[in-house]
Amino acid sequence: MEFDCEGVRRLLGKYKFRDLTVEELKNVSVSFPHFRYSVDTYVFKDTSQKDLLNFTGTIPVMYQGKTYNIPIRFWILDSHPFAPPICFLKPTANMEISVGKHVDAKGRIYLPYLQNWSHPKSAIVGLIKEMIAKFQEELPLYSIPSSNEAQQVDLLAYITKITEGVSDINSRGWTNHENKILNKITVVGSGDLGIACTLAISAKGIADKLLLLDLSDGMSQGTMDLDIFNLPNVEISKDLSASAHSKVVIFTANSLGGSESYLHAVQSNVDMFRALVPALGHYSQHAVLLVASQPVEIMSYVTWKLSTFPATRVVGIGCNLDSQRLQYIITSVLKVQTSGKEVWVVGEQGENKVCSWSGRDGVLSPSSQAQLSSRAMELLKVKGQRSWSVGLSVADLVDTIINNKRKVHSVSTLAKGYYGLDNEVFLSLPCILGTGGVSEVIKTKAGEDTVTGTLQASASSIHALQQQLEL
């Protein structure tokens, strides 16, 4: 079948990089001439919809001496080729999905090639070649008896409506045990912050296994040093599937450099997370996702939307470090006779953070609290947020989560419904943390007009930026 360049060009319509996409699909047709192209509505996890080019067909997979034609579907995002395709199996009525390392229960395909996608070195032809190689190791589909076909038709009707997501269904081909690892933690990103988190968590001794996912090309200096000095229970990998069964997955990776505007910088982070979060959520379906990537409020929201996890299991590091410092300043530097544990820094990381009291501290009058907060916040401003200090703060949060300490931390959580907020935004609020993430948001003092006004202003600006992002 001859590739119809002009027909595909018309289908691409308003795609940003139409010529590049047409050229790549033309190359695909040389090896796979029978793919069929169309434009259909793609439903994202946040229920938003977009008309996207997609193509379907089969790829030949040799398994145990026999060739199987595996039906697949590729969705091409409008930012292609700078964003990877979204890939699904397309089983017929007599086929059933075999959930495994690279396929979830809804047929979505996860591969290292997708996670490491980078134009121009990445291409759909290369992706298909890796797909074939992985499926030769573990066949993603198997036939079902004819008596079960009616049931499968219903399932397929459901699958066609589902485009993304994580299922907690335990199906054949996927291990049902936890590999006998009690406390496994994954750190995503091998930059300075990722290394700092790895070292701080290792020093606390709270992980039976600690995995550092290195997303860089080649080996970074930090990961090379970790390899050389061989920390106990620490493993370095580039394979996302190595993170399977983690109790906490920590996102430290950032892709903010070289962008022409703040919006473009944040969008580049979102694009990276689009390839990471669904796969990592698939491999660790009961994990708490701890976000340290910047801007933490927005990236926590993005992680929540892409993972489809309950909001309680997506936690941003928020103002935990500033809160711990503030409490230390009040009790140890200013020598105030109070526990210091009833005051937190809340809101948005950066200049818009604000001090808030829980109302349980009966030692200080409201006016004394206000004066103390002002003095303490002035001292707090001289403190930076270097990687090692953030790493210690992350380790503190992980310790509370892993050991179910139910301590109060000021962390980024879904703030809708608090302080009169109506939008889905993440802001730092005092929360009780445990193995399930956020179990409760602590109420602070009523009538704090400054706090309420600051949080509402932050929420408004964050929501406005989120509306401009492409998830």
Swiss-Prot record:
PROSITE patterns: UEV (PS51322). NAD(+) binds at residues 191-219. It comes from the Eukaryota. InterPro entries: L-lactate/malate_DH (IPR001557), Lactate/malate_DH_C (IPR022383), Lactate/malate_DH_N (IPR001236), Lactate_DH/Glyco_Ohase_4_C (IPR015955), NAD(P)-bd_dom_sf (IPR036291), UBQ-conjugating_enzyme/RWD (IPR016135), UEV_N (IPR008883). CDD domains: UEV_TSG101-like. Residues 2-145 form the UEV domain. It holds the Pfam family UEV. GO terms for biological process: carboxylic acid metabolic process; protein modification process; protein transport; small molecule biosynthetic process. The keyword NAD applies. GO terms for molecular function: oxidoreductase activity, acting on the CH-OH group of donors, NAD or NADP as acceptor. The keyword Iron does not apply. Keywords: NAD, Ubl conjugation pathway. Signal peptide: none annotated. Possible negative regulator of polyubiquitination. In the N-terminal section; belongs to the ubiquitin-conjugating enzyme family. UEV subfamily. In the C-terminal section; belongs to the LDH/MDH superfamily. Homodimer. PANTHER family: L-2-HYDROXYCARBOXYLATE DEHYDROGENASE (NAD(P)(+)), UBIQUITIN-CONJUGATING ENZYME E2 VARIANT 3. This is Ubiquitin-conjugating enzyme E2 variant 3. It comes from Mus musculus.
